[in-house]
Amino acid sequence: MALEKSLVLLPLFVLMLLVLGWVQPSLGKESRAKKFQRQHMDSDSSPSSNSTYCNQMMRRRNMTQGRCKPVNTFVHEPLVDVQNVCFQEKVTCKNGQANCYKSNSSMHITDCRLTNGSRYPNCAYRTSPKERHIIVACEGSPYVPVHFDASVEDST
C-alpha cells in the first residue's frame, strides 16, 4: 500500500520539479522596462555636480559588474513624465528602428562617461549634469520606455 502511494506520488513530484525548473528562471529575469528604470531613472535626486555621483550610482545600479559600462544617463524627473515621452514626438532611433520618441520639453539629466584610462574593476566616471530633451525607445503593453537612445539640446 505504501509502495503504491510512493509510485503515484513520484511522477507528480518529478513533474513539479520540472515545472519549477522552467518557471523559476523567468521569475528572476528583469523586464526591459524594469532594466530601463534601474539603469536610467533617479527621480529622487536633482542633477548633481558632485564628482562622485556617477561612480556611486553606476556601482549601486549594478552597471560595473564584470565590466565598466562606458556611457550611461540618469534622468531626474518623475517616472510618469518619462513614460509620457512614449506619446510625444516620434523620431527614428539610432539603430534605425521606428519606436523612439523625443520629449517635448528638456529634462534634468546626468551623463556619466567612463574616464580615459579607467579599467575594470576600478570604473571611474565623469559626471555631467545637463538639461536636455531625451529620446527613448518604447514598447510593450503598457507602452513604456525600454531603452535610452540619446539626449539632445534644445533646438531653439
UniProtKB/Swiss-Prot annotation:
Annotated glycan sites: 50, 62, 104, 116
GO MF annotation: an example: ribonuclease A activity
Annotated positions binding substrate: 35, 38, 69-73, 94, 113
UniProt entry tagged with the keyword Nuclease: yes
Family matches, as InterPro entries: RNaseA, RNaseA-like_dom_sf, RNaseA_AS, RNaseA_domain
SUPFAM superfamilies reported in the protein's UniProt record: RNase A-like
Pfam families: RnaseA
Main location: secreted
Signal peptide: 1-28
A biological-process GO annotation: defense response to Gram-positive bacterium
Family: Belongs to the pancreatic ribonuclease family.
Alphabetized SMART domains for the sequence: RNAse_Pc
EC number: 4.6.1.18
Cellular location(s): Secreted
Subunit and partners: Monomer. Interacts with and forms tight 1:1 complexes with RNH1. Dimerization of two such complexes may occur. Interaction with RNH1 inhibits this protein.
Record-annotated disulphide pairs: 54-112, 68-123, 86-138, 93-100
Protein name: Ribonuclease pancreatic
Organism: Nomascus leucogenys
Catalytic activity from the UniProt record: an [RNA] containing cytidine + H2O = an [RNA]-3'-cytidine-3'-phosphate + a 5'-hydroxy-ribonucleotide-3'-[RNA]; an [RNA] containing uridine + H2O = an [RNA]-3'-uridine-3'-phosphate + a 5'-hydroxy-ribonucleotide-3'-[RNA]
Function: Endonuclease that catalyzes the cleavage of RNA on the 3' side of pyrimidine nucleotides. Acts on single-stranded and double-stranded RNA.
Cellular component, GO annotation: extracellular region
Residues annotated as the enzyme's active site: 40 (proton acceptor), 147 (proton donor)
Domain of life, per lineage: Eukaryota
Keywords, comma-separated and alphabetical: Disulfide bond, Endonuclease, Glycoprotein, Hydrolase, Lyase, Nuclease, Secreted, Signal
Matching CDD domains: RNase_A_canonical (cd06265)
